[in-house]
């Protein structure tokens, strides 16, 4: 993935980031290339790991996740192995786990149905990973999943 992107690759990556369902024909028009050239470039971007997959964006509220929160976690015993991400990976309500610099070791993005469900989840996180937690409930999301592609 060290190979630099040329201008055409950047166009294709920007277009795919904006609409992962864009057809090869649409991409070809936007990039000024033939469909076969675009297909070859997209395959190369995929094999290099620049394009890592295609997925649908689901509205969390539409599937019953009415409450989202950031949960910062810190191991209770720093002398023990730092394996919190692996211990929490199976918990479905944990959408993302980020290693961070600062007071906490990790920040989790969690989605649950209610405040009570968050309380239960926090207890599971504490018990499963032997961590302390600090939660911030998300009131409104103005934007997310933005990708800057120079």
From Swiss-Prot:
Record's keyword terms, sorted: DNA-binding, Transcription, Transcription regulation
Tagged with keyword DNA-binding: yes
Induction (UniProt): 15-fold induced by starvation.
A Pfam family this chain is assigned to: HTH_24
Ranges annotated as DNA-binding: 24-43
Function of the molecule: Transcriptional regulator that probably plays an important role in M.tuberculosis persistence. Regulates the expression of several genes, including lat, rsmG, whiB2, lsr2 and Rv2011c. Acts by binding directly to the promoter region of the target genes.
UniProt note: domains: Contains an N-terminal DNA-binding domain, followed by a rather long linker and a C-terminal effector-binding domain, which is also involved in oligomeric interactions. The ligand-binding loops of two crystallographically independent subunits adopt different conformations to generate two distinct effector-binding sites. Amino acids like phenylalanine, tyrosine and tryptophan exhibit binding to only one site, histidine exhibits binding to both sites.
Protein's UniProt name: HTH-type transcriptional regulator LrpA
Organism: Mycobacterium tuberculosis (strain ATCC 25618 / H37Rv)
Underlying gene: lrpA
């Amino acid at each position: 993935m060290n190979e630099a992107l040329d201008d055409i690759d950047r166009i294709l990556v920007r277009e795919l980031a904006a609409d992962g369902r864009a057809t090869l024909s649409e991409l070809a028009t936007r990039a000024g290339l033939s469909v076969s050239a675009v297909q070859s470039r997209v395959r190369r971007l995929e094999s290099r790991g620049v394009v890592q997959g295609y997925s649908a964006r689901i509205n969390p509220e539409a599937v019953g996740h009415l409450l989202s929160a950031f949960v910062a976690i810190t191991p209770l015993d720093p002398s023990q192995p730092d394996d919190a991400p692996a211990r929490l990976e199976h918990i479905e309500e944990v959408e993302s786990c980020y290693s961070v610099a600062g007071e906490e070791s990790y920040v989790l993005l969690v989605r649950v149905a209610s405040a009570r469900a968050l309380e239960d989840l926090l207890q599971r996180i504490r018990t499963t990973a032997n961590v302390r937690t600090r939660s911030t409930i998300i009131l409104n999301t103005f934007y997310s999943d933005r990708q800057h592609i120079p």
